[in-house]
């Protein structure tokens, strides 16, 4: 996998260095094709530059975002990796605008998942794990949103393409794994060979469907731990208060602060000790719980973790929040495979990931608003569309998988769309970078204010 990424980056570098030299050698037909594609992309961007108005491109983007939310809702990954290519390629907006829209759409879809997890009668959410992940994830989101304003669009395009390629590879591998498990369970059930025990087969079936259906087979009613949920809200609110004090891009907030002044950066830097304090408290609480009940911890709502894994989680959540803030994706597609590789059960991973995506996506959306995001009315409409699609998707996918017994179909669907998005985003991103370069536009880093 690392080799593929290195080759991918080398190809991008070769393209950037030799593009000017190869331009003269291109056949006339290639010039005409590139010119027509460039004209089409320019016309889309010009129509979306000032204000997004109702058009065929916007309607098509809304339909595709509805389908994307429909597919990704049951997996608990947020869907940001699908929303951004749709907005950039179909609606014609730039990558930064698409990232801000994606934050709103991911928020809308995650609300549907949170409602399903909290009030669906399932004991799957690991609130202790969420308490351990949330502070550093919100810190990463804050830094990521600033990076979105500072980094040039060509660099964001490269980072997003690499990230999406990695996520696509992990998703397809998971799909193959699920397909093999489904086939094995089907063969054993069909031939009536319970050599490994019916209980073990049922357990594998439950684990197989849990990441997508969030373990609909779990029938135990769960009480919502309001204390832990309240602590999570307090953590979110603590970061939110800092954003309110900071104000918008003009420095207008509860208190008047000069944008990018000394007070501005001191206020933002308070998020670092805040995240460290909350993370330390969560680590101490998790360690004390596991020391008090080392034998029956797995039977409780929490997940038993070794010390090295517990220390690794804050760094993982920070990276997920950072990329989520830059791309507006919520971070679910990054943190979900990392949690699975760390030994977290799939059903707990899916439920907890969708819960964390809600917190990170809402924080990204709030920051984009405070930083002067445009076309907010359209973003609200897209968010509501994704909310409805996610609710419908949770119901339809559960029925479809229950009927056909192939939960891996959804994994392959998401992986296929993500792979296609990687190719399209890389192609059109390279074309946009080349267009800006030829036009002599500034392609360097920008000030955060």
Swiss-Prot record:
It is a multi-pass membrane protein. Its main location: membrane. It comes from the Eukaryota. The chain crosses the membrane at residues 1-21, 57-77, 78-98, 101-121, 127-147, 150-170, 224-244, 259-279, 315-335, 353-373, 378-398, 409-429. Keywords: Membrane, Transmembrane, Transmembrane helix, Transport. It is found in: Membrane. Belongs to the 4-toluene sulfonate uptake permease (TSUP) (TC 2.A.102) family. This is Sulfite exporter TauE/SafE family protein 5. The lineage of its organism: Eukaryota, Viridiplantae, Streptophyta, Embryophyta, Tracheophyta.
């Amino acid at each position: 996998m690392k080799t593929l990424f290195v080759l991918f980056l080398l190809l991008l570098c070769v393209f950037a260095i030799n593009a000017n030299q190869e331009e003269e050698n291109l056949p006339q037909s290639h010039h005409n094709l590139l010119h027509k594609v460039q004209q089409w992309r320019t016309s889309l961007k010009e129509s979306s530059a000032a204000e997004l108005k109702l058009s065929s491109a916007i309607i098509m983007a809304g339909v595709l975002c509805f389908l994307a939310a429909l597919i990704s809702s049951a997996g608990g990954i947020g869907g940001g990796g699908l929303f951004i290519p749709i907005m950039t390629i179909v609606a014609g907006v730039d990558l930064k605008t698409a990232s801000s829209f994606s934050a709103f759409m991911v928020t809308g879809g995650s609300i549907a998942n949170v409602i399903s997890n909290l009030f669906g009668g399932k004991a799957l959410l690991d609130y202790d794990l969420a308490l351990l992940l949330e502070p550093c994830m919100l810190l990463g989101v804050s830094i990521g949103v600033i990076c979105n304003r500072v980094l040039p669009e060509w660099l964001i395009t490269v980072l997003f393409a690499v990230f999406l390629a990695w996520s696509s590879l992990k998703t397809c591998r998971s799909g193959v794994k699920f397909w093999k498990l489904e086939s094995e369970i089907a063969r054993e059930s069909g031939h009536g060979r319970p050599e490994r025990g019916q209980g073990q087969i049922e357990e594998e079936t439950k684990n197989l469907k849990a990441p997508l259906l969030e373990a609909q087979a779990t029938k135990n009613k769960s009480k919502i731990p309001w204390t832990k949920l309240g602590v999570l809200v307090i953590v979110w609110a603590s970061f939110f208060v800092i954003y309110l004090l900071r104000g918008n891009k003009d420095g207008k907030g509860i208190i008047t602060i000069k944008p990018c002044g000394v007070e501005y950066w001191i206020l933002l830097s308070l998020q670092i000790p805040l995240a460290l304090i909350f993370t330390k408290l969560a680590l101490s609480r998790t360690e004390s719980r596991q020391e008090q009940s080392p034998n029956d911890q797995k039977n409780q709502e929490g997940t038993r973790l070794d010390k090295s894994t517990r220390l690794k989680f804050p760094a993982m959540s920070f990276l997920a929040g950072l990329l989520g803030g830059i791309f507006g994706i919520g971070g679910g597609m990054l943190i979900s495979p990392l949690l699975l590789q760390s030994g977290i059960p799939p059903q707990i991973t899916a439920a907890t990931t969708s819960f964390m995506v809600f917190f990170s996506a809402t924080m990204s959306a709030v920051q984009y608003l405070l930083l002067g995001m445009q076309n907010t009315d359209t973003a609200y409409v897209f968010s509501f569309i994704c909310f409805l699609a996610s609710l419908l998707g949770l119901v339809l996918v559960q029925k479809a998988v229950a009927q056909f017994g192939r939960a891996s179909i959804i994994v392959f669907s998401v992986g296929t769309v993500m792979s296609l998005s990687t190719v399209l985003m890389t192609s059109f991103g390279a074309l946009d970078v080349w267009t800006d370069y030829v036009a002599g536009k500034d392609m360097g880093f920008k000030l955060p204010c």
